[in-house]
Amino acid sequence: MTPLVLLIIIGAYLLGSISSAVLISRLYRLPDPRDSGSGNPGATNVLRLGGKSAASMVLVCDVLKGMLPVWLSYFLNINPFLLGIIGIAACLGHIYPIFFHFRGGKGVATALGALAPIGWDLSGMLIGTWLLTVFITGYSSLGSLITALAAPLLTWFVKPEYTMAVSMLSCLIVLRHHDNLRRLFEGKETKIWQKISRKAKLK
């Protein structure tokens, strides 16, 4: 590992540590997403708390946190395995942000951003998988889990040399959703539509 790669890994973690959900919630005068709603500082929870505008900004920022360092590394011809490490560093920053007392999100949008440099076709398939799952089941967490599990297989069809790197990212996302997985098995996970409608009734 070269000093440049090490510097990019550190930079990816620090960039990932910028919690856009918390900052944008402050900008919109919304409750802290770490202490409200699902307690997850991510776009889905901000959608429940503040609506589409704030959630869209959070989503874009979270995607960019993963995309920028990996895209830079991609154009520097850094090998696929190290690209995976850089993507994981960005996701770990999002999940355990040093600037926000290590209270972060699930890392789904940041992981999607990290996968984007592999190809827009792969990104489209992953987004489609998530949307279809959420549309059918209503569970955002299940959409994330199924998309994470499908990502290595889809990558193998598109660019097989990146399968190992994507598999590492997928494992991180699945592990981060262990609480959601337990609630799904227990039938206690709340559907995203129920949470949004509940918020609307409170207004």
Curated annotation (Swiss-Prot):
Pathway where it operates: Lipid metabolism; phospholipid metabolism
Enzyme kind, highest EC tier: transferase
Main localisation: membrane
A single Gene Ontology CC term: plasma membrane
Record-level Gene Ontology MF annotations: acyl-phosphate glycerol-3-phosphate acyltransferase activity
EC number per UniProt: 2.3.1.275
Topology class, membrane: Multi-pass membrane protein
Substrates-to-products reaction catalysed: an acyl phosphate + sn-glycerol 3-phosphate = a 1-acyl-sn-glycero-3-phosphate + phosphate
Family listed: Belongs to the PlsY family.
Summary of the function given for this chain in its UniProt record: Catalyzes the transfer of an acyl group from acyl-phosphate (acyl-PO(4)) to glycerol-3-phosphate (G3P) to form lysophosphatidic acid (LPA). This enzyme utilizes acyl-phosphate as fatty acyl donor, but not acyl-CoA or acyl-ACP.
PANTHER family named among the record's database cross-references: GLYCEROL-3-PHOSPHATE ACYLTRANSFERASE-RELATED (PTHR30309:SF0), INNER MEMBRANE PROTEIN YGIH (PTHR30309)
Protein name stated in the entry: Glycerol-3-phosphate acyltransferase
Gene for this chain: plsY
